[in-house]
């Protein structure tokens, strides 16, 4: 079985948790996507922000991590859940 496109995999993962930041998303997807050249924090943050712009995710909060870097938490919206149910095969959910 193949892999979902990375952005779709991010949305699918967000459907399984109450909220997550980019590091948590990447840790969860690393077993499947960690060897990809594009498995980089800036790109995965872009995936999260793009899904937010499209109404599938929303910001759940923010704070500073232990390195004093900004950490943005996201959560899935009802539209995001509907998109997962409608467009992502049950095999991947």
Task: Report the location of each language-model feature.
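Short alpha-helical segments that sit at the start of domains
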Residues: 1-19, 92
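General structural signal for alpha-helix termini and helix-helix connectors
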Residues: 12, 16, 31-35, 63
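Short acidic, hydrophobic short linear motifs in intrinsically disordered regions
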Residues: 20-31
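Short, positively charged loop/turn segments that connect secondary-structure elements
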Residues: 31-45
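Short, hydrophobic-biased segments on the C-terminal half of alpha helices
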Residues: 45-52
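A short, conserved structural fragment
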Residues: 52-63
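Short, Lys/Arg-rich nucleic-acid/phosphate-binding segment
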Residues: 61-72
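Short, amphipathic alpha-helical interaction segments positioned at domain boundaries
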Residues: 72-93
């Amino acid at each position: 079985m193949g892999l979902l496109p990375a952005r779709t995999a991010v949305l699918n993962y967000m459907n399984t948790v109450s909220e997550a930041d980019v590091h948590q998303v990447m840790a969860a997807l690393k077993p499947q996507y960690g060897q990809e050249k594009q498995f980089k924090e800036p790109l995965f943050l872009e995936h999260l922000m793009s899904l937010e712009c499209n109404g599938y995710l929303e910001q759940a909060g923010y704070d500073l991590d232990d390195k004093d870097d900004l950490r943005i938490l996201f959560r899935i919206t009802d539209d995001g859940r509907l998109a997962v149910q409608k467009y992502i095969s049950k095999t991947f959910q």
